[in-house]
């Protein structure tokens, strides 16, 4: 995924109202940018940290700039735009960069499924293959020694998705929970049972029901983002 034009940068002043952030540019002018991430953003939104933003060509947008990346004091890069994770995984599958998913012929997104009226992030189909339901989750919470965690806050929506994936697996389909790691400092991923015990419990049940876990990390810069490596996962 290439950023065209290349992302611009500034210094974070503050994030507020969940969807907005004020930044200071190199010329000391200030600008309000849109923040697509409504989560806790723990460690991703420290005042005076460097942020990178894109500019929309949509002239009707009230805030044409979108917060894409943050750089931490340890020089780690984090993608804070939650819309990017699905786009990255779709691109990686289409480019045959996810070795576990190269046999499928057709890819669809946002398809209705399940008994709880959800929409699956990605549905793969192929001749003589079980349908493959993929739910994508972005991982940006870093603890010590390279340990990444998901979720970074209690997620009832995520719990619902686990129940839906379990249902698909029990019906004989392939069901995958795909962790897209969008923090350059993360070396391995685990479930944050200390944050959301119910999610942890539901994932154990989902795995027992046949849900598979994939965990891949992206490389990120002001010019592009792409899925590049598989990371270890533990429950």
From Swiss-Prot:
InterPro entries per record: SfsA, SfsA_C, SfsA_N
An annotated Gene Ontology molecular function: DNA binding
PANTHER family: SUGAR FERMENTATION STIMULATION PROTEIN A (PTHR30545:SF2)
Family designation: Belongs to the SfsA family.
Protein name: Sugar fermentation stimulation protein homolog
Organism: Aliivibrio fischeri (strain ATCC 700601 / ES114) (Vibrio fischeri)
Source lineage: Bacteria, Pseudomonadati, Pseudomonadota, Gammaproteobacteria, Vibrionales
């Amino acid at each position: 995924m290439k950023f065209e034009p290349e992302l611009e940068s500034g210094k974070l002043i503050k994030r507020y109202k969940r969807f907005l952030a004020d930044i200071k540019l190199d010329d000391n002018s200030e600008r309000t940018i849109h923040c697509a991430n409504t989560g806790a953003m723990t460690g991703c939104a420290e005042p005076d940290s460097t942020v990178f933003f894109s500019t929309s060509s949509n002239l009707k947008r009230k805030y044409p700039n979108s917060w894409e990346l943050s750089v931490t004091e340890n020089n780690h890069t984090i993608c804070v735009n939650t819309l990017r994770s699905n786009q990255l995984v779709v691109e990686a599958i289409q480019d045959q960069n996810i070795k576990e998913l190269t046999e499928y012929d057709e890819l669809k997104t946002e398809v209705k499924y399940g008994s709880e009226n959800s929409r699956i992030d990605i549905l793969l189909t192929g001749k003589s293959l079980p349908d493959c339901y993929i739910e994508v989750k972005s991982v940006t919470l870093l603890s010590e020694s390279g340990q990444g965690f998901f979720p970074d806050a209690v997620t009832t929506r995520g719990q619902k998705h686990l129940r839906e994936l379990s249902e698909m697996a029990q019906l004989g389909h392939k069901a995958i929970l795909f962790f897209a790691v969008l923090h350059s400092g993360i070396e391995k991923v685990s479930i944050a049972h200390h944050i959301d015990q119910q999610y942890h419990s539901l994932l154990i049940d989902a795995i027992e029901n046949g849900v598979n876990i994939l965990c891949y990390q992206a490389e990120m810069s002001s010019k592009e983002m792409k899925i590049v490596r598989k990371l270890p996962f533990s429950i």
